[in-house]
């Protein structure tokens, strides 16, 4: 049983070190046994006899003893040799054992070192093979990716080419408009988002928030302009893509250029339609002004244009691009800020555009045409003996001598630092003396039409090099019967320097073309005839005050109740037909509700307010401009800075709290000289605007509702204390 139990014991596995140790022990035991057996063998051999005693001196010599002595000597020598050989063999055997043991130890150490070295070499070889394998895999993956990229690029190029061919021969498919389900369209939203907060429009604190006054850096804030950074990053990414395409050998196709141009136009349109109201235009630099800021600027100064390729107006004298001498003269004359007509006309005159200015007397129009005229003359050679016989460089005509002399004084004042000679030719003075002044040479002639024509007919003056003409108060000159004289003077000028009638035609850089300024308070038919004959692609600049800007707008004010507003609104829109109309509300919630009601009533309506995204605003405005929608329900976001042409009717569904907001709202109609209609629903809750509204209606000769005229709030300005009636009107009651 014990042996069976021993046989069932589990085998014991030895490590490499244990096996080496066990082998060494076994070898040591074998060597020890071998030595022990050799020693036993030596001990078993017979010992040699002890050496004989030394011989005595002079021993007896006989033959037998010498023979015995010789044999014993031989035996002794033999034994000695045998012992010596045995010791030598034993030492040799011992050395051999030591050498074999040393060799075994050395071989064992060598084997151990070789095995570890082989292990290290094997591991290093494995690592090298793995590294080479990974490098090869990466190269293959990179090659596969590059191949896939090139295949995809080639596939895209083929698809673009096929699309271009299909579009050329089959025509492009018109994108289908996504139909919105009524359940999604009229889904009620229970919460208002933070972006729909209208407190910015109502609270002045939100309109001018406090900003950090940092003393370093430039840009939006301390040199960090997020919008500018996005533009720079987009431009850098575009350049990187173009460089990659050039390295890959891919040429830009016209289709790609068209796509890039379309994207650039879209980006420019987005920047121009910037609806973010962060600062007023007075707090922005010239580069930061957006299209909306320029529209608000023009509305603030009641500047309107009619024409093509109109430059931006100037906001201050430092932005006028006038010469240093002229700016010094302007500063010396005490002109701190330019007037609206100067803001609009001077940039046009510096571009030598023909201008028709409609402005009242005293609006500063003299400087509006004198400064560009002097800037033009400074670019010409000075008048000398060689060219003084050819006449002046510029002519200004005025209807009366008083006005001509006034213009002369202003011109001399502005030409102080230029050395330009100015001569006036008016009636009541000697014509010979005036002709003598002209023959002496002058750059500018200021005259009345009749006297100037007399000088031309008598050969006192010529206009061979006159290329700058100003007609001040042209309508008044026509009314006074000076039309033939004006035509005669204009015909006396060389006609070869007239600009081509087609404004797209390229102008000759070496030719000096005529520039004509015409200022008039009105545009009668005779003035229009002059403009059509002598002006080339003129820009009409209209300047007027807020009250006069509303003369073209018929204002209707209806006193009503809140419950009657919607029915009245639907009746007005029904009578209007397909003509565009804008309905103004005070809040975004009210605008959405009114739009929903009008949509249910069958009107094509869209909304515009601060709660909409940039894309939604553009879509709404484009749809309204393109007549896909006939009604635009908006808040005061559309009241300023947004130009919507041909608006036939403006309806104030909810009256604003200030008269300025009311003025800007109704200013959406009656634009560009066209007549417009404005209707306002007034309730007894709008008492804050009663007084100012009544005054505006009276000034514009519009009907005032009896309820508004009799109301107590319309008799006194809000916040003022009414005067006490005279004491004589008091009734005194006697007491008994």
From Swiss-Prot:
Question: Gene Ontology cellular component?
Answer: catalytic step 2 spliceosome; cytoplasm
According to its UniProt entry, the protein's GO biological process terms are: mRNA splicing, via spliceosome
- Region (Disordered), start-end ranges: 25-178, 231-263, 704-736
Q: Where is the protein localized? A: Cytoplasm; Nucleus
Q: Which reaction does it catalyse?
A: ATP + H2O = ADP + phosphate + H(+)
Where is the motif (DEAD box)?
472-475
Checking Gene3D superfamilies in the record gives:
P-loop containing nucleotide triphosphate hydrolases (3.40.50.300)
Residue ranges annotated as coiled coil are 14-38, 137-167
Might you give the EC number(s) for this enzyme? 3.6.4.13
Please list the residue ranges annotated as the Helicase C-terminal domain: 568-712
List compositional bias (Pro residues) regions by residue number.
Answer: 46-58
Biased composition regions of type Basic and acidic residues, renumbered to the chain: 25-38, 64-166, 231-252
The Helicase ATP-binding domain covers 346-541
One Gene Ontology term of the molecular function aspect:
ATP hydrolysis activity
Keyword terms = ATP-binding, Coiled coil, Cytoplasm, Helicase, Hydrolase, mRNA processing, mRNA splicing, Nucleotide-binding, Nucleus, RNA-binding
Q: Which amino acids does the record list as binding ATP?
A: 359-366
Motif range (Q motif): 315-343
Record's domain comment?
The Q motif is unique to and characteristic of the DEAD box family of RNA helicases and controls ATP binding and hydrolysis.
Q: Give the similarity note.
A: Belongs to the DEAD box helicase family. DDX23/PRP28 subfamily.
Name the job this protein performs: ATP-dependent RNA helicase involved in mRNA splicing. May destabilize the U1/5'-splice site duplex to permit an effective competition for the 5'-splice site by the U6 snRNA, resulting in the switch between U1 and U6 at the 5'-splice site. May also act to unwind the U4/U6 base-pairing interaction in the U4/U6/U5 snRNP, facilitating the first covalent step of splicing.
Under which name does UniProt file this protein? Answer: DEAD-box ATP-dependent RNA helicase 21
Instruction: Give the species.
Output: Oryza sativa subsp. japonica
Q: What does UniProt list as this organism's lineage? A: Eukaryota, Viridiplantae, Streptophyta, Embryophyta, Tracheophyta
